[in-house]
Structure formats: structure tokens, C-alpha cells
Amino acid sequence: MCGIFGYCNFLIEKTRGEIIDTLIEGLQALEYKEYDSSGISIQGDELKSLNIYKQTGKISSLKEEIDLYNLNKNLPFISHCGIAHTRRATHGGLRRANCHPHNSDPSNEFVVVHNGVITNFANLKALLVAKGYVFKSDTDTECIPKLYKHIYDTSIELGYNLDFHVLTNLVLKELEGSYGLLCTSSHFPDEVVAARKGSPLVIGVKGKTDMDVNFVEVEYLDQEEDYLKLNTQTKSSGNVLAAAPVKYNTCLRKSPPLRSQYLRNSTTSTFNHGSSTETPAENGLPRPMEFYLSSDCASLARYVSKVVYLEDNDIAHIYDGELHIHCSKIGSEDFSFRTVQKLELELSKIKKGPYDNFMQKEIYEQCETTKNVMRGRVDAFTNRVVLGGLENWLTELRRAKRIIMIASKSSFHSCLAARPIFEELMEVPVNVELALDFVDRNCCIFRNDVCIFVSRSGETTDTINALNYCIKKEAVTIGVVNCSGSSISRFTHCGVHTNTGPEKGIATTKSYTSQYIALVMIALWMSEDLVSKIERRKEIIQALTIIPSQIKEVLELEPLIIELCDKKLKQHDTFLLLGRGYQFASALEGASKMKEISYVHSESILTDELGHRVLAVASDNPPIIAFATKDAFSPKIASCIDQIIERKGNPIIICNKGHKIWEQDKQKGNVVTLEVPQTVDCLQGILNVIPLQLISYWLAIKKDIGVDLPRDSAMSAPDI
């Protein structure tokens, strides 16, 4: 799956062209998430009609597809709801029929866009096919709009006219798996519902006048009386979706809608809605409003400054300029409101500026982002680290008998990089776990464990699943994320925000170095009461303060790296990266970047495992990149590099400035050196990884690869 975007205007006139442009711009803001098709749904020319436009390829192909219909783009809509989606093929291959949005039938009575995975879709599909529904795609999503239609038709046959959010709740009760979805319907004109379970959704709110509102009340659904009960046993063969009548209740539509007085397309359907806490009427009249819905808050930055993050099991219902949030799951830990938060994103930070692409911009931003993660937290005068987000849990954290860091992808590598300093400073066992494997193994977790969850987006599905597992085991949880309103930031007990800003490139660059520093700061803060570590802590804190300026020095290597890629590297499709100690994590991260961005096979190897098999490969002269900066392992790394040179390999050595050991080999042309500033051993990996980021970037550029949208990459792991 990939990106969701929606736009609703109420009593604010917009032309069809403006609505289409808004939806397209919203999708373009989500382009940094890898996708292979896109689509939108908007209101048609006829009363209570919806049109769908979708196409494979880039969003530009979708725009061309829309233009083929010669739509009247000047047609005004005083109120309207449109939805859009970019898709990365998961269930079903890349063909137009599999693109979102998906419909319930040829007349588009219900239209859905969806992120996530419906795990019981095969059973639902079989049941719906038995009912006469025809499926045109191979996706799991298509069962959702058809289920909407089936339940809606069944309720009408029984004499019940359900409200949209009640109907949605009935549909969601039949779904297993994860979802973030938007649904519009010709039966509910100018309305949209949004539902979340395991896949993020955020709603931006904008009025013509300022609103002094800080929360939206949650309206809990009465599961016994407030909707029809559907008895669906999808795990048994031969069963069908059936409805049992229930008594008349207040969720059934009864009174004429407000829209008949104000909107261009009035309707004779009847319903009854409660009042909205978020968008109260102004002087007794409805307030002109705009709502923007997305799976990523970064896409909302240009439109709104106030957002509401949906929680799992939430159903948001937007109609008549009002936002209602319903929840079907009542628990002791559930809040009765959703906070309206200020969106702390600057528009300039989500634009390329003078750079050719986002990856290049984000590599160069590391001078600033490493400052940002330390700002107000690292005090070089007192040699202290202050982490306000952890203070309330100080006692529990310092009492930890074990620390477990859990992450995926590059975040996992940052955890590996920080593990040795945690072990050294804290003197407790430290485990680093891949989130998916951690959950699969049902690891033993105890109440005196501290579990640290690291994620760039804060929405990585595997990491969230691991977090939920640890919460059930009553461990103390820390979140290290870049997005303050993300699931991980909200569900953990405490946390550290990396303040990295939006990272729109697929490749993790600035987030990796910021996570690395954040984890080191946590280790420093948690070990503050250990007297034996005072001098070591001072050394690290002083080194942290000059890291941003040292990164600037490393970036000056770019001309040399461009020449190296052009003359020696671009013709190769296999690379070996050698590292040991702190630098093995750098080798892992560098190899990952080269695979992801440059489309080359790259392998990270512990230097002392440079046995006969690896040396046999080295004799074929693939480029070998070795991390040989000064630390406790330098002599052994030098010995391994000598073996490579003896076998006529020509390694590229990342070493410290002024390190004379390689001068003779360099003069003979046996090696190429990339010299970086020296820092304390536990921070050297921050500087060492940047040349690999630049090599990956320039190899891709030399091969005409789109670095911001590499193939077969995704920002967050799907729920599979």
C-alpha cells in the first residue's frame, strides 16, 4: 500500500478543477513513498454520483488520464468530498483494475481507498461472490466497498436507514487485519468516513476564521443497540452474510439534513446527527470549513496548521462542516477525546530548495539535524544531558535489568551502532532486535526490562506490533521517533523526539544520524548516576558538541567521491564493506544504502571473518570499502586490508585525517583513502557513514536512477 489523501469543503465554493488540483497536489506530497499507480474519486455531473479516475505509472499519467475526459473544470461545488490514493502493488499486480480507488459496483455507490492488509479478504470475497458480486481486481481492498453495499442494501430491505458511521462500523466488524481507509458514497453525498486500525490517518482542520478548540470528543458506539448485528462466520464454509433485525434506535436517519438548505446538490434522505465539538456553529449558523485527510501529516503542511490524529478503532465522520469521531472499543485506557494538535512543519522543509533531489538535500541537512537533536539537551559546560521526555520515568529507567532496542531497517542499524555504548555505560545486558523477528519469537519480556522502539516515521507496522507486545508484558517503553504525533510516540510511556524534520527521500540519511545521537544521549542520561563513568561521559559529551562541524568537513569529500564513482565504481555491480566494532553497523548501513539506491549487490562483513571464501571473491577485484578509523580494532583491520592488497585488491579505505599508515600504499596506487575527522570511538560511525551515503547517491546518479523514488522500496513495512 502507500498514500491516502482526501479533501472536503463545506460552504466554501471550489471549482471541480480546484478540487482535482488539491487532490493531485496531496498525492504529489506523498510521492516520496514509493508507488506504482494512483487514482482519485470526485463527484460527477449527475446528482448523487461519483466518478473514479485512476492509472498506472506516475501521477503525471493520472493527470493525463483525467484530461482525456474533457471534464467541466469550472463547475462550482459549494460542498464536496473527494478521495485519492497512491498504490504500491502488494495484493494484485500492477494493472489498472488493481489501482485505487475501488468501487462497490459500476454505479460507484461506495468508493474506498485503503492502506493495510485485510487478512480474511479471501473468505469475504468468496461469500460476496456467492451473493452475486463481481470482482474485477486481485486486491484485498475491493471486498470493502462491496461489503459496504451488501450491508447497506440488507439494512434497507429490513427497513433501516443507517447513518454512515454506523454502516462503517458494521463493515469494520467483518474485517480482519489492518486498515487506514476513506469511504465516500452516492447515498451519503458530501460526506466521508475515515477509519483506522494499525495504519495511520490524520485529519487537518481549517476554517475561514480561527477556532479556539483543543480537542474533539469521542462518541462511543453502543454495540448492543446502536446498529444492526451481522453474523458473519467467515472461517466456516457455506456460511453467508446475514442480518438480524433489531429495535429502532437513535442512529437511524430521521430528520432532513442541513445540506438541503445550503448545498448545490440537495438530497431527500433523512438523518440525525449530534453536535460537533471540533467545529461548532458560529452565531447559530454553520461554519464554512475545509478538511484534509492523509496517511502522512507532512502532506498537510501546505494546507493546515491544526490536525487530529486518529487512534486505532476510531471512525471519523465528516459532514455539514463537522468532524465527529466515533469509537466502537471502550476500554479503561481509552481517552474520551482526541487532541487537536498544532502541525509543527515548515513548508520550506518539504521542498527541495537549491538541490536536485531530496536525498541530496537531506544528506547536506545533517549538519543542522544533528544540532537539532542535541539542542537544549546537551550541555557542554556542565557535561550533562537533559532529556525532559524521560524525566517522569527516571526511577524505572535507571532500575532496568535489561535494555532491549527494537527496530527495523536503518533504525535497526542505528540501534546496533549504539549498543556498545549502552553496554559500556549502563553495565546491563543490551539486546538489539529486528521487530518482525522479535514478535515471531514471542520473546520473554519482564516488568524490569526497558524496551526502546526506534522508527523514522513512528508508524512502522512491525515495530508497532512489537510495542504492543511489550506493553502487554508491562515493560517500560521508550520511543525514539521523528514524528511527534505518530503511533509509537503516543503509545510508548516516554520518548525522545529527534527533531529531524521531514525526510522525503526513500533512503534514510539524516534520520539515521539523528537516531544514532538520540540513542547515545539516552545512554548518557541513564548512566548519569554511575560515578565510575564520569570521565567517559565527559569525553562523549564534548565530542557530541563538535559533530555538526565535523559532518561539514566530511561533506567536503563530495568532489573526490564523484570522481571515484565516475572512474572506478560505476561499472561494478558487487561491493564488499568491511567493519568491526562500532563500524560494523556503519558497514551494514552503507551496504543497505547501496542496495536500495544504487541497485548493486553489496555485502557487509566483519573484518575478522575475511576468510577464504570472502578473499576468493576479493580476488575478482570487486570494490572493497573498509572502515579503518582509529579505535581499539585498528591494528586488526589494518592486517585484513593488507591481505586484500596482497591479493591484488584495491580497497577504498575510510580513515582518519593524518593517518599515515596508508600513505605508502596510496602512493603506489594500491588504495584510495577517504579521510574523515577523528572523534570518540562511539560517535565515529556518524562521520563514517556519510561517505557511504554520498557514494550510494552518486552511483545512482551516474546510472540515471531516481534516488528519491527507487524501485521496490517502501517507507514503512506493510502488515504482512
Curated annotation (Swiss-Prot):
<dbReference type="InterPro" id="IPR046348">
    <property type="entry name" value="SIS_dom_sf"/>
</dbReference>
<dbReference type="GO" id="GO:0006487">
    <property type="term" value="P:protein N-linked glycosylation"/>
</dbReference>
<feature type="compositionally biased region" description="Polar residues">
    <location>
        <begin position="266"/>
        <end position="280"/>
    </location>
</feature>
<dbReference type="InterPro" id="IPR017932">
    <property type="entry name" value="GATase_2_dom"/>
</dbReference>
<keyword id="KW-0808">Transferase</keyword>
<comment type="function">
    <text>Involved in amino sugar synthesis (formation of chitin, supplies the amino sugars of asparagine-linked oligosaccharides of glycoproteins).</text>
</comment>
<comment type="pathway">
    <text>Nucleotide-sugar biosynthesis; UDP-N-acetyl-alpha-D-glucosamine biosynthesis; alpha-D-glucosamine 6-phosphate from D-fructose 6-phosphate: step 1/1.</text>
</comment>
<dbReference type="InterPro" id="IPR047084">
    <property type="entry name" value="GFAT_N"/>
</dbReference>
<protein>
    <recommendedName>
        <fullName>Putative glutamine--fructose-6-phosphate aminotransferase [isomerizing]</fullName>
        <ecNumber>2.6.1.16</ecNumber>
    </recommendedName>
</protein>
<keyword id="KW-0677">Repeat</keyword>
<dbReference type="Pfam" id="PF01380">
    <property type="entry name" value="SIS"/>
</dbReference>
<dbReference type="InterPro" id="IPR035466">
    <property type="entry name" value="GlmS/AgaS_SIS"/>
</dbReference>
<feature type="domain" description="Glutamine amidotransferase type-2">
    <location>
        <begin position="2"/>
        <end position="321"/>
    </location>
</feature>
<keyword id="KW-0315">Glutamine amidotransferase</keyword>
<keyword id="KW-0032">Aminotransferase</keyword>
<dbReference type="InterPro" id="IPR035490">
    <property type="entry name" value="GlmS/FrlB_SIS"/>
</dbReference>
<feature type="active site" description="Nucleophile; for GATase activity">
    <location>
        <position position="2"/>
    </location>
</feature>
<feature type="region of interest" description="Disordered">
    <location>
        <begin position="266"/>
        <end position="285"/>
    </location>
</feature>
<dbReference type="InterPro" id="IPR001347">
    <property type="entry name" value="SIS_dom"/>
</dbReference>
<dbReference type="InterPro" id="IPR029055">
    <property type="entry name" value="Ntn_hydrolases_N"/>
</dbReference>
<dbReference type="Pfam" id="PF13522">
    <property type="entry name" value="GATase_6"/>
</dbReference>
<feature type="domain" description="SIS 1">
    <location>
        <begin position="393"/>
        <end position="532"/>
    </location>
</feature>
<dbReference type="GO" id="GO:0006002">
    <property type="term" value="P:fructose 6-phosphate metabolic process"/>
</dbReference>
<feature type="domain" description="SIS 2">
    <location>
        <begin position="565"/>
        <end position="710"/>
    </location>
</feature>
<dbReference type="GO" id="GO:0004360">
    <property type="term" value="F:glutamine-fructose-6-phosphate transaminase (isomerizing) activity"/>
</dbReference>
<dbReference type="GO" id="GO:0097367">
    <property type="term" value="F:carbohydrate derivative binding"/>
</dbReference>
<dbReference type="GO" id="GO:0006048">
    <property type="term" value="P:UDP-N-acetylglucosamine biosynthetic process"/>
</dbReference>
